[in-house]
Swiss-Prot record:
Listed GO CC annotations: cytoplasm
Keyword line: Amino-acid biosynthesis, ATP-binding, Cytoplasm, Glycosyltransferase, Histidine biosynthesis, Magnesium, Metal-binding, Nucleotide-binding, Transferase
Cofactor: Mg(2+)
The keyword Transmembrane helix is annotated on this UniProt entry: no
Coiled coil: none
Protein name as it appears in the record: ATP phosphoribosyltransferase
A Pfam family reported for this protein in Swiss-Prot or TrEMBL: HisG
Record's function text: Catalyzes the condensation of ATP and 5-phosphoribose 1-diphosphate to form N'-(5'-phosphoribosyl)-ATP (PR-ATP). Has a crucial role in the pathway because the rate of histidine biosynthesis seems to be controlled primarily by regulation of HisG enzymatic activity.
Amino acid sequence: MQTQRLRIAIQKKGRLSKESQALLKQCGVKFNVMGERLVVHSENMPIDLLLVRDDDIPGLIMDGVVDLGFIGENELEEVRLDRKALGEPCEFVQLRRLDFGGCRLSIAIDKDEEYNGPQDLAGKRIATTYPQLLKAYMDEAGVPFSTCMLTGSVEVAPRAGLADAIADLVSTGATLEANGLKEAEVIFRSKATLIQRIGEFDADKAELINKLLTRMQGVQQAKESKYIMLHAPAGKLEQIKALLPGAEDPTVLPLSADKQKVAVHLVSTENLFWETMEQLKELGASSILVLPIEKMME
């Protein structure tokens, strides 16, 4: 039955859509998104993907319409605060913070304006798409202000005379700079997250959710890890291990042609920079290979 299938909401378009789909595919979920279809059925698992607007996803989870959802923490918290203020259901379970979709919600002001802290915003009119997050921050700071609610092109509000400042999502700051603005205050940091509805699941759905979570953990660990192979002086093994924090102890094998050295294989959770490789070389390591890992399960 259709209701027995796991229903996952993902953003139809936008910054999180491609990466959410890519993560599911890396977890072995086969599907094909075509055209304007709003529901996509997995080819190999009892999973349905619902392609919806990002600001609809928290509500679908909180109302129990879907089982799981990929959403930015900024959008999730904005909707939660809004629904809480309206007395609507706003509960969910955060299953896993993901390693993509990083951004921050920041207050930006005219690039030539002096800024000493939130108190400088007292009495200002601030344009934003996130009124609840802005209000929560300003209320906590004890700063009175007024909101100019916009659904897009927030950065042009000061030049258009609509507002004195803005509160908008920032990734690099290039858009702010192009519009004569500068970042003054970070009010919320966000990444993509996987959330789940409140309530019980039957055994099959619960098992499938746990399987997906285990695979997601493996995908994320693989991204953060490297498989390293090198030859090392046997007497310097402990010093070399200290440079390469690993998931487990390394595999150490004798070399047939050189009894003074051993072959070392390990998975390192540390980013391996050129400086680290140079330090390894100084310790006598040679034939150093650093390889990416596609999948990983401990």
